[in-house]
Amino acid sequence: MQHARIFNSGGQSRRNHSGSSNVLSSQSLSKSNSMNSMSASQMSIQIGASRVTSSSSGNHFMNRNMRSTITVGKKHAPIEQQIHQTQTPNLTSTVQPNLKDPIPLTVWFHDLRTSDEDVIIDSNAIPGGVRNGQVYMLQSLETEDSKKLLFVINDRNIRDNNAAAQDDLQSSKFQISLISNPLQKLLDIPPRSLVQIKRIQNLAKVEADSVEIFIKDVNLSRDSMWNFSSTLVNSCVHIDKRLLFLNNRTGIVKYIYKNGRNVFSGYIGENTKVTFRSESAKLTVLVQLSREMWHFEENGEIMFHKLVNNLFPKMFKRWRDRNTHHAITIVLFTSMDLTDIPWTTLGQGERPNNRRDYFRVVVDQVNIFHWDKIMANLRLEFANFKRDIMLNQQDTNHYTMDGEPLPSVKGNILEAVNLGMTLANNRFINTDLKHSLNHYIVVTPGTGIYDVDYELMLETSKKMSTIDYGLDIICLSQPPLHVVPLFRFSKDGKVKHVVPNWCDISYYKDSNQSANSWIPRCKIYELQMMGVMENNMNQIRIDRFQVTQKAPTMIEAMDNYDNDLFKPVNHRKYIKENDEKAIDSYEIKEKNNSKFKPTTLKNANATLSLIFNNRTRLQPTELTPSNSSVLGTVTHSNGEALSTLYNLNKISDDRTISSLAPSISSTRSISSKRSMDILRKETHSPRLIKSDSLFKTETGASTPAEPRTTKSVERERKSRHLMKHYESENPTDIFWTEIENPSQEYRADTLLYPNVSRWSNAFPDKIRRRLVKWRSLQSPAALPITTSVFPSVKILETEYTFQIYNVLLNYENYLELETTHELMREMIQLRLLLGFQICFGDQVKKAESERKPAGNVESLIKYLPRHSSLGARIYMSLGDEIHRIYLDYNGNLNVQLYHKTVTNEENKITLGQAKLTNYFPLIRTRYADEYSTAKIDGINSKPKMYNWNQFDQYLAGYEDAMPDANKDFYKMKFVVMPAPIPKNAFYITNENLTDEEIRVEGLRKLIAMIEKGKYLKRKVTSKKEEILPEIVFYTGNLYDFLNEEAQNFDNTGNQAGLMIPESMRFNKSIKLSELAEELQTRSTGLPLVDRTWHFKRHLHCFLGSELVSWLLECFEDIQTRDEATSYGQSLMNKGLFKHVESRHGFLDGYYFYEFESEYIDKTYIESKKGWFGIKKTSSEKPDTDSNTPVYTRNNSDVESLSSPALPSQDPLDLKRITSTLITDSGASSLEGSRRRKKFILSRAVKYNVDSLGKSFRPEIVTVHYDRVHNPEHCYHIRLQWLSTTGRFIDEAITNWSRLCERHGLKLVETPWKELCNIPSISPFHSFVDIKLCVNPLVDPEFSDVKILRKNRFYYHLYFLKKFEFLLDNRSSLFFSKDSIEISYSWGKPSFQYAQYIHKNGTYIIELRDNGDFFLAPNNIHITRVNTTLTSIPDFDGSITTYNTNSQQVMLNFRSACQNEDYLKELFREAKSNWREEFPLDMMPTDLPQ
């Protein structure tokens, strides 16, 4: 039979005796094996070869026996001496070529089942063998210009070491085998053809400059990107290579760049820039509907039609063609001018004072598959947008028009960007496991120039420098004749022009327009509106151009061109040191000379003039290097006409700049090129340099020992530019580049400053960028992990404050870290996760080298070593913060924090008044009927800042170092709801189970699955099966059920499993003063006695073991003695007690401890009026010092005054029922809390989401699941984690969901916080406020006192049940019972309103106190389901039906609320079905259908 994994699809085959084709039978295998050991009297001759061309004579030797092997020997040779199929002999065993010479081999192919390695090689086929780490290049001999494949030798791709390949390829005598998919198609190599491989000696020649990896349907966090990139170092990749991360398919390589060219394969070194692009991102498109959007374009097309008929359809088509899974939000926005002053009278940098901003949400987190519905909504909203914002209804039939839209230059683009950035305020709020990035796209009809406020521009720049969101601006107008994007503002009475480095700009041009058509760049309204035949045309007639006698003729111009082109050229490969210094000195002299006349470029090299000519042209993207923001430049030309025309054709070419004239670098010296660069700097350019001293020092100190190449000189020149940039006096230079004259010429190096940004490494070097950055729009790039942005040593010393602390690993930690190497990795990963970048480059090396005394440049790392990281140090930056993490050779972790000081100017602005006014625009969400004021300040809301000392101590295992209020990490909430019973549902033999019984069994299995997945350090094998916790099911009212459990305990003494024992009356959030009082209470506290040890008497002390036992018995959130010991150590650190001789920490054993003086019971010594009468005032202050090490005294009394789950001021006064909020009113309050029955209704499990052990670390999440459940309500599962890999969490959730589906259940993700908080978190999230047209609370027909007194919202609950809504969360009012206290393992419930969810999980509704409804789509569930469905090949019908049904739920519900007849009929039905047993929180279960 045919071999399943080794095949020869392209070559001819022979059939064996069994009739199968392409077979290597066992008989031929034995024959081929025998060929390896021929006797001396035998020889093997290969006649012909596969696909080898004949000689020039055209005669073939034994042509009829081509591709055969003849064994020649004695007459009595063995039977094995026969003609076999083609076996390529190993000629290298007899001929030893030079290692630098190519080695010819015959290529085979294997599939993924054999091995996932791209290349499997037989080491015997290579002279001298192969070794791990060697890099080889493979190239086909079939064609001259074939692709080159690079691969690295490792243990897995050597045939002798690859067990799977050895077994599957044992029937073949192959020398090298490639994976068939995709290499066979990409390389276009037929099987069994000849290839050559060559060892690469100098890896720098093949090391890629940049690699772009595309990811989809996975949330690859920034820390995972760093780990992923580190696994790629010292490996080779090729185009379309699928990459694995933690044994999961994660990305695919799409682009590899080397020296400005896109290559097929490359070697990834430590200096290679790895860029991640997402094909499943969250896109927010902000469309500016300014005044120009209703204007005609120069070609007669309305701007908005250009948007909806050209731009958006092309974008959606590109997304669909690439099979991307983006979730898109489209928002229309504009700014209305409410003044009577024409905007044309405003100066540059000025805007009207009286403005009103509008935002209209068209679609909200909709999958781009529904592009047709999106476009329909977009056209409809555009038609009504201007009417809705301009018409103001005064009375019933009276309307007024207020204001008119401003043009884009005076618009609110920065306000819109700030409002969108509010989603980035809390980095832990994004728990979408299917989408990786957030990206903003601003579409404007303007030309890329905007008048803004200086303070707002500065604040926006600061925010953009601290978040990882990208911003693209797309202009619908023609590119202007100035630098773009350009922001103007007025500062100190002067108008400033700046180019920001945190955004990119594109200019959309319809591809259908003719390339020969001329479109004016300047818009002259009077000229556009003038008729062609009008006489006024004569008024603007231009006089005929008079040619002077000095102008050269065309013949003279061509002669001059030929003379310049063919004149002798001095070939100089290197530049001398003195020449370089001379050039540098000349450059400095020119820069210091403020007044100089522009020089004329005479007798310039004609070839160079084709590239560097100064003719006037706009080059917004075509000639700008790719590592920069898009900068359109205007240049002025002295060049002749012929060279100008020649350049017109050159500019349209798609090749890189370096490819325009490949002979320049080889024929022209560096000095001439540098001279050309200097001469091009004639015109006045913006001076961003503080002083020239650093530049001079750097030039003078540059004394290379050997001649430098062009590349090294260029790199050094750029490095000097960067250092000059960072020596600038203006602190805003890190955000933008100030331009004195936007219409003046600027070299690429001058405009390099804005390229030095956090996004610089996202773009490959020396690549010409397109007019429209389709790649960025199709697949947005993630913020690079590394950055070269770093301040100079001088700035670090003068403008930064310095802090330092050490981190010690507690081996009893939540993350199960065992070494400081692992702790250092977690600290780096957490910073990357929260937006930090790794600083790497010459500036960092210089700063480290000048550190005193322990600076060591060689120990700087970009990626963490795999095993030991002793001595390693790494710099990381975010905004104004720089962190240096250093692991010394003793295993101690040292963290140094640099904070940039606030400038005097900023201090002046902030004194006495706010810098920026509050910004609450009018927003109309997707389903809202009118505009309403935003619930969040779009400008003054800032990203959350973190205390990194607390974070590091928390990672090290000291969880008490961080207050509970700050432990607001990643959280996910799931509800398990009834669903249709599938055909393959669970069943028990010979038993007929009802649907409810099947679902109950499914919940039991789900909880058993979670319990079995608990993380265990060491697996304990037991003969007996573990007894797993069970869910307690009930029907009816929850409080009735708990009261029944409490009464059973009072009557029988048998404590229910849900109850907390009477002794467990505290938890870890108790105040120290209250705990000290309890510990010293005679009846219930510790035995405090006077003890003698070694003739020393210790008064009023206790044993460490006694305190551990007491904590284990009395604290509800302490389960083991280890936890009690750790908590006791934290109490000791906070100053509650100490060792009697101050020789030990807190230990579980026979060790004596005594209370500190401020907490000791003074009545033991002398009688005083009260407790803690002499307590120090300082002890009441919380620990707020971020630099305090773990083992220092502090006091957390104030921290426990408020629960993390409750607001500081609760209108319902819920503090009186919270066990963690015991007041200081005395023993009576404590006794009152003890009499209350306490129930904990959920259980926390430390769950291992990586059950297969794929990761290099424990992947742990905390899972909270309900211990009680009413089948008529939703069952809850909550997840919490800090830095666990999202891919493993997604896999665990998928497994849970599959189990639920087999038992008629549905796992639905819902927001952790209640629904009413959404508008204050996400301003663009859709929601609907709905009022019942018939309010049963006030309607005389239904306001029955008997019903409303028993259940105020009975009619509303009946209405919700009719529309298949299930109870999700109860309001906090429900838990305010004096007799019973309810708590959960995840905290106290704090929902203000009762919340319900539809049975399909797509919509959530809140019931307000006044009987109104607040309805919002469950976007996180809809997005997850749509992403999953679009991944299925045949998904069109299912996803369309699902999305339509989800929207229909809202439409039907809103329609019913507005239907008076329907509501009255339904309420009458509800009144007739009323029964006494319907409690407050219960929904009727037996409604008539």
Swiss-Prot record:
Residue ranges annotated for the DEP domain, each copy included:
1082-1157
Q: Provide the GO MF annotations for this entry.
A: GTPase activator activity
Q: Which SMART domains match?
A: DEP
Q: Where is the composition biased (Polar residues)?
A: 51-61, 1185-1206
Respond yes or no to whether keyword Secreted is given for this record. no
**Among its keywords, does the record have Ribosomal protein?**
no
Query: Which spans does this entry mark as compositional bias, Low complexity?
Result: 18-46
Q: Which GO terms describe its cellular component?
A: GATOR1 complex; vacuolar membrane
GO BP annotations of the record are: cellular response to nitrogen starvation; cellular response to oxidative stress; intracellular signal transduction; negative regulation of small GTPase mediated signal transduction; negative regulation of TORC1 signaling; positive regulation of autophagy; regulation of autophagosome assembly
The UniProt annotation puts the region (Disordered) at 1-61, 694-718, 1176-1209
The record's keywords, sorted A to Z, are: Membrane, Vacuole
Q: What membrane topology was assigned to this protein in its record?
A: Peripheral membrane protein
Name the InterPro entries for this protein: DEP_dom, IML1, IML1_N, WH-like_DNA-bd_sf, WH_DNA-bd_sf
Q: Where does this protein reside within or beyond the cell?
A: Vacuole membrane
- Basic and acidic residues: which segments have biased composition? 708-717
Q: Which PANTHER family does the UniProt entry name for this protein?
A: DEP DOMAIN CONTAINING PROTEIN 5 (PTHR13179), GATOR COMPLEX PROTEIN DEPDC5 (PTHR13179:SF8)
Family of the protein in this entry: Belongs to the IML1 family.
Protein's name in the database: Vacuolar membrane-associated protein IML1
Q: Which gene encodes it?
A: IML1
